[in-house]
Amino acid sequence: MAVYNYDVVVLGSGPAGEGAAMNAAKAGRKVAMVDDRRQVGGNCTHLGTIPSKALRHSVRQIMQFNTNPMFRAIGEPRWFSFPDVLKSAEKVIAKQVASRTGYYARNRVDVFVGTGSFADEQTVEVVCPNGVVEKLNAKHIIIATGSRPYRPADIDFHHPRVYDSDTILSLSHTPRKLIVYGAGVIGCEYASIFSGLGVLVELVDNRGQLLSFLDSEISQALSYHFSNNNITVRHNEEYERVEGLDNGVILHLKSGKKIKADALLWCNGRTGNTDKLGLENIGIKVNSRGQIEVDEAYRTTVPNIYGAGDVIGWPSLASAAHDQGRSAAGSIVDNGSWRFVNDVPTGIYTIPEISSIGKNEQELTQAKVPYEVGKAFFKSMARAQIAGEPQGMLKILFHRETLEILGVHCFGYQASEIVHIGQAIMNQPGEQNNLKYFVNTTFNYPTMAEAYRVAAYDGLNRLF
């Protein structure tokens, strides 16, 4: 058994692991990374964020081709199969792996391929693919092993027509009708993708409103758009059982309803990847979803062991995971890079996309904050008209008296990009966070960014 000594060992090479390893390495620490894949990037690169967003981009291009009058004049709408569209995503994955492999090489981070588990509080044993065991001793260890789809024991995920958000990327045909169980972020994104390919989608939601954490107006806009695009949303429903057929599936609901489709995509929750870490050897406990509890420094109950990313739960975003990993390493190297990541923009890549930051109307009303609203509808924006993307709006919530921006919510074309302008102003200290910034700033024309000026004027006109 080979033995190696490090300052920091990072378990997992997804966004959290990458952020942690890079920060520690740049602070002069000797760093090792352990991942069970031969290629770095974690689930984000191989099964989650990157392939699904690349897939979405390709589907959106197909939708534009099939609905744009100029292209329709050339010929009839084209049909593309799911496997064909997926090929473009595979190219992006390869490029991402190459980039990230280069990061670790340039920063002299040693990458170990294998399954890592704790022998004790300062030792990780790595079982390599060839069966060889290597021992890594470290002063500090960061757990960033991510998560995987939650799989109820009573559902047969080995059935060829039953998928989760990982295995859906191996779908070898294009279903005519698809059931998506779970209307969270992942479920809504895949419902949009398959709808864009002309698939009839049944989206089953166990709550009364889509993405209820969003501003209610944005949630309602998404529901309306879904209803116009071959997506039937069934609220307040729970599954009783899943019946697999030779040519499809039947979803039995507790309400007594039955839904038949060519395939089922299960998108109801995630489970932390902690079951193979040997946490029982060091006294770290996990919750019912396999997640680790950490403090504001991302430290677990064992002082030299930290956690970051999906493995610690909320908010389970790639963007937040990277910052959490970087902050966990910052707690170790004490280079001023630590911060508790609690206010990050939400990006939801439905078609159209959604993004938000800060408070929504429900929260401000409940807190009895005197706020006002400013809106800019994309159908009136020159850039949106040029792009043929009239759906959507930008919504700014601000304090009636101080004009402090309290929340930014966007639905439509480039929403995940637009939100960062509002985020930047909201993070300014004191009176610099002010709605009038958007009135007094010159925006390029035509751009989607100038929606901020339109929304600011709209909001100021509501004051009296």
UniProtKB/Swiss-Prot annotation:
It is found in: Cytoplasm. It comes from Pseudomonas putida (strain ATCC 47054 / DSM 6125 / CFBP 8728 / NCIMB 11950 / KT2440). Binds 1 FAD per subunit. GO terms for molecular function: dihydrolipoyl dehydrogenase (NADH) activity; flavin adenine dinucleotide binding; NAD(P)+ transhydrogenase (Si-specific) activity. Conversion of NADPH, generated by peripheral catabolic pathways, to NADH, which can enter the respiratory chain for energy generation. HAMAP family: SthA. This is Soluble pyridine nucleotide transhydrogenase. The keyword Oxidoreductase applies. Its EC number is 1.6.1.1. SUPFAM superfamilies: FAD/NAD(P)-binding domain, FAD/NAD-linked reductases, dimerisation (C-terminal) domain. PANTHER family: DISULFIDE OXIDOREDUCTASE, SOLUBLE PYRIDINE NUCLEOTIDE TRANSHYDROGENASE. FAD binds at D35, D36, R37, R38, Q39, V40, G41, G42, N43, C44. It catalyses: NAD(+) + NADPH = NADH + NADP(+). Its cofactor is FAD. Gene3D superfamilies: 3.30.390.30, FAD/NAD(P)-binding domain. One of its GO terms (cellular component) is cytosol. The lineage of its organism: Bacteria, Pseudomonadati, Pseudomonadota, Gammaproteobacteria, Pseudomonadales. Keywords: Cytoplasm, FAD, Flavoprotein, NAD, NADP, Oxidoreductase. InterPro entries: Class-I_Pyr_Nuc-Dis_Oxidored, FAD/NAD-bd_sf, FAD/NAD-binding_dom, FAD/NAD-linked_Rdtase_dimer_sf, Pyr_nuc-diS_OxRdtase, Pyr_nucl-diS_OxRdtase_dimer, STH_gammaproteobact. GO terms for biological process: 2-oxoglutarate metabolic process; NADP metabolic process. It is an enzyme of class 1 (oxidoreductase). Belongs to the class-I pyridine nucleotide-disulfide oxidoreductase family. It holds the Pfam family Pyr_redox_2. It comes from the Bacteria. Its main location: cytoplasm.
